[in-house]
């Protein structure tokens, strides 16, 4: 027997009567059923103010397209890297191979997951525990973090896109991920069945993961000949070069691997100026751990603005991209849609409540490539964003973000360590407070 009371007939009748008694409800129903909620709720007065003009713009060329995949974190990190590479090679347009980066991220994740789970199995972790079930359900998603991307580039480098192009399975990752997930689930089941054979099970599963990835994505190059003609028409030839050498030569000057990830975790128990991390989150075993320095949102804004204005390079960030997004026109603002007016409902959660009660978390990574500052030189009005959803939407793929939306829905940025004050540099040397694997601060890596 359950003690949850059912919805009674009288209650249902009252709901229907109350709805039909309101002319607003009838008009809203007619409009939304015909046009959809976003078109009906769109705030015209706010939308017309979302101008695409900025006082500082970093030109990064044609917008890339991640297609039907969750590789935003790789695309956005490589978009930062390609800006540096284009400057160093004198190119107007250039793309790194996102397929190459994903190949080695997935291969490393297979190894990381198996050895992480093996430790738990050997320690007696029950197969039906919350932790084990979370790890099993979360395995082989496409998401990731800045630090995880840098771990891949440090170990494997990068290659130009035309030397390891997209495949059907890199653009549409669902089927391949299902097969990898099934293979890993089978391996874990075998570990529980025979713990004495765990090492052999891991070796077989890593080999299987390599086969699956190579069948779907192709075999990545170990070295290649690189030739190009720069924007001034001058021909260049590097000769044979490895992916690691290529990365170091054309991106190494920016020292992206040493960047620090700043987050705005709004929950009061997580103190600003302290490091936090997520248990069991990573890809390259032996690589840098996925840790963040928790700071005020305004400090993140100040860092991004300083980088754009003084260094002139894109800035990687993670956000909850869904709320108040006009995808077609490429705009985010906290009042861009008036859903509450249409429904007669108050959506009054603040940022901390949205995180705590599962309403918001990081789910998309992009790059800031512009900012608009008022005449006073202090007030930021809007931000220009390089997305990775192709150039057929928004301003040829570039989005406009209001400053108040940054406050509410941007959670993370990657910045040079040199921008941090002494107290934050000291905090980086202290151990991180580790949060459980299912904490929302790790959601971008799903």
Regions found by a protein language model. Give the residues of each.
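N-terminal regions that are enriched for targeting/export leaders
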Residues: 2-61
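Helix N-terminus capping/helix-initiation residues
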Residues: 8, 36, 97, 242-243, ...
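Active-site nucleophile-adjacent alpha helix/oxyanion-hole segment immediately C-terminal to the catalytic cysteine
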Residues: 47-315, 377, 383, 393-396, ...
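Catalytic nucleophile-His microenvironment captured as a short glycine-rich beta-strand/loop
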Residues: 72, 153, 356-390
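Short His-Asn-centered micro-motif
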Residues: 75, 317-320, 369
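Generic recognition of flexible, low-complexity loop/linker segments
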Residues: 290-293, 301-307, 353-358, 367-375, ...
């Amino acid at each position: 027997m359950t003690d949850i009371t059912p919805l009674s007939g009288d209650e249902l009748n009252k709901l229907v009567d109350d709805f039909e008694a309101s002319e607003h409800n009838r008009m809203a129903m007619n409009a939304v059923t015909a046009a959809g909620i976003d078109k009906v709720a769109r705030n015209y007065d706010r939308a017309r103010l979302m101008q695409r003009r900025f006082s500082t713009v970093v030109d990064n060329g044609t917008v890339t397209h991640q297609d039907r995949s969750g590789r935003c974190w790789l695309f956005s990190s490589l978009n930062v890297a390609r800006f540096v590479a284009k400057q160093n090679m004198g190119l107007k347009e250039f793309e790194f191979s996102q397929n190459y980066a994903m190949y080695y991220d997935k291969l490393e994740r297979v190894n990381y997951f198996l050895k992480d789970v093996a430790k738990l199995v050997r320690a007696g972790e029950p197969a039906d525990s919350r932790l084990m079930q979370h790890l099993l359900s979360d395995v082989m998603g496409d998401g990731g973090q800045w630090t995880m991307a840098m771990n891949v580039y440090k170990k494997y480098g990068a290659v130009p896109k035309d030397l390891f192009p997209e495949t059907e399975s890199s653009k549409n990752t669902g089927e391949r991920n299902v097969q990898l997930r099934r293979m890993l689930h089978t391996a874990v089941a075998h570990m529980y069945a025979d713990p004495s054979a765990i090492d052999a099970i891991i070796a077989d599963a890593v080999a299987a993961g390599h086969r699956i990835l190579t069948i779907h994505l192709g075999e990545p190059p170990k070295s290649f000949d690189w030739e190009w003609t720069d924007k001034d028409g001058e021909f260049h030839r590097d000769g044979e070069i490895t992916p690691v050498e290529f990365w170091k030569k054309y991106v190494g000057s920016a020292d992206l691997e040493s960047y620090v990830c700043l987050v705005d975790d709004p929950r009061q128990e997580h103190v600003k100026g302290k490091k936090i991390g997520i248990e069991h989150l990573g890809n390259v075993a032996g690589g840098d751990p996925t840790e963040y320095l928790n700071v005020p949102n305004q400090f993140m804004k100040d860092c991004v603005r300083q980088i754009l204005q003084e260094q002139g390079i894109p800035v990687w960030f993670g956000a909850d991209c869904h709320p108040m997004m006009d995808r077609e026109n490429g705009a985010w603002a906290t009042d861009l849609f008036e859903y509450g007016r249409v429904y007669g409902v108050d959506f009054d959660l603040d940022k901390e409540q949205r995180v705590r009660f599962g309403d918001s978390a990081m789910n998309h990574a992009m790059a800031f490539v512009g900012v608009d500052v008022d005449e006073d030189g202090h007030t930021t009005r809007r931000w220009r964003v390089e997305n990775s959803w192709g150039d057929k939407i928004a301003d040829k793929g570039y989005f406009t973000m209001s400053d108040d939306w940054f406050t509410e829905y941007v959670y993370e940025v990657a910045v040079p360590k040199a921008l941090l004050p002494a107290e934050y540099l000291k905090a980086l040397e202290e151990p991180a407070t580790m949060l459980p694997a299912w904490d929302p601060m790790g959601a971008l890596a799903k």
